Amino acid sequence: MTAIAPVITVDGPSGAGKGTLCKALAESLNWRLLDSGAIYRVLALAALHHQVDISTEEALVPLAAHLDVRFVSQNGQLQVILEGEDVSNEIRTETVGNTASQAAAFPRVREALLRRQRAFREAPGLIADGRDMGTIVFPDAPVKIFLDASSQERAHRRMLQLQERGFNVNFERLLAEIQERDNRDRNRSVAPLVPAADALVLDSTSMSIEQVIEQALAYAQRILALPLKK
């Protein structure tokens, strides 16, 4: 009987450092990587490329079920590959974002993408980045991590990111947006943002990213006893 590939899930709110942690874990363990937050954007871009009617659930479901996407982490950078093409920047456009929101409203599309996400589970293992990876998508994952940070710290990190890109941003506005999203995500009726009962909860508010990676790796190694990538 073939053993099921192990999964490390990393859930948490926006700005907690999930993406950076997941890329580091994937490179250290040489495992596959799933960025669930990008899945809907990739589907939206595929629909635009193939001129699929995004207002029709029936047209989107088969595209979602057979979405040709993979995620590659190299030197700390995440590449999103759609049908063999790097679309890492293209999926971040406003047009794709709006299209993704429309696609996410269809229950059958969500179900198809849930199955597609689970199909990423292949040997030697998978790092799954999201908000409900440990509670909904991979509830049997042997290693679950919930990465959190105060809303103030997450707003500060986001402000620095935007300033580095040349944007003039208001901290109080960023903080209000993050708190509003937190409230919506944590209190929604379907797949609320909560730690799995068996998850390791890491508060990164006063931690460096190096400390977060070190603790997460140590925890995963203790449970899985797997060698690090040379």
UniProtKB/Swiss-Prot annotation:
Record field: catalytic activity: CMP + ATP = CDP + ADP; dCMP + ATP = dCDP + ADP
Species: Yersinia pseudotuberculosis serotype O:3 (strain YPIII)
Lineage: Bacteria, Pseudomonadati, Pseudomonadota, Gammaproteobacteria, Enterobacterales
Protein name per the record: Cytidylate kinase
Family: Belongs to the cytidylate kinase family. Type 1 subfamily.
Gene Ontology biological process terms, A to Z: nucleobase-containing small molecule interconversion; pyrimidine nucleotide metabolic process
Gene Ontology CC terms: cytosol
Record bears the keyword ATP-binding: yes
GO molecular function, one term: ATP binding
